[in-house]
Amino acid sequence: MITTEGTRSLETLDIEKLLSILPHRYPFLLIDRIVEIDGEQEAIGIKNITINEPHFVGHFPAKPVMPGVLILEAMAQTAGAISLLRLGNKQTNLVYLMTVDNAKFRKPVIPGDQLKIHVRLLKKRSGMRRFSCIAEVKGVRVAEAEIAAMILEKE
């Protein structure tokens, strides 16, 4: 995990910077900010979970729970943002999720939670990236997965 010890230079991305990097928009932009970036190696993203999100209407009306697939998407967006950030001209590239491996959902994520998404680059080869991802709420692991993504030029 990222620490603030030593001489690392850590970056952050607010919502305006994220909107300039990622193509996602409401209701499918699933990260609010990135609070720490260490090069292209690691990042921590934040998603504040609110009852106003459209998926809670049907998942589940009496006991709202964030769908696991949206937690995975938040992981992918965090990884994609740091990948695109390092490419320079971000507007000409897109990141496509290719695989999800070893996904585990350990605890429900509910309105009022703050999802903290840790991503760490495992492998980088030409346009492909593989990341280890962990999602936490209040320091407790709620989900984890390994994801692979491909960076391609927009056509």
UniProtKB/Swiss-Prot annotation:
Subcellular location: Cytoplasm
Enzyme Commission code(s) on record: 4.2.1.59
UniProt keywords, alphabetically: Cytoplasm, Lipid A biosynthesis, Lipid biosynthesis, Lipid metabolism, Lyase
Catalyses which reaction(s): a (3R)-hydroxyacyl-[ACP] = a (2E)-enoyl-[ACP] + H2O
Residues of the active site: 59
Gene3D superfamilies linked: Hotdog Thioesterase
GO CC term (a single one): cytoplasm
Pfam families tied to this protein: FabA
Gene Ontology biological-process entries: fatty acid biosynthetic process; lipid A biosynthetic process
Superkingdom of source: Bacteria
Membrane spanning residue stretches: none
Molecular function GO labels: (3R)-hydroxyacyl-[acyl-carrier-protein] dehydratase activity
InterPro entries linked to this entry: FabA_FabZ, FabZ, HotDog_dom_sf
Function: Involved in unsaturated fatty acids biosynthesis. Catalyzes the dehydration of short chain beta-hydroxyacyl-ACPs and long chain saturated and unsaturated beta-hydroxyacyl-ACPs.
Family: Belongs to the thioester dehydratase family. FabZ subfamily.
Protein name from the UniProt record: 3-hydroxyacyl-[acyl-carrier-protein] dehydratase FabZ
Lineage of the organism: Bacteria, Pseudomonadati, Pseudomonadota, Alphaproteobacteria, Hyphomicrobiales
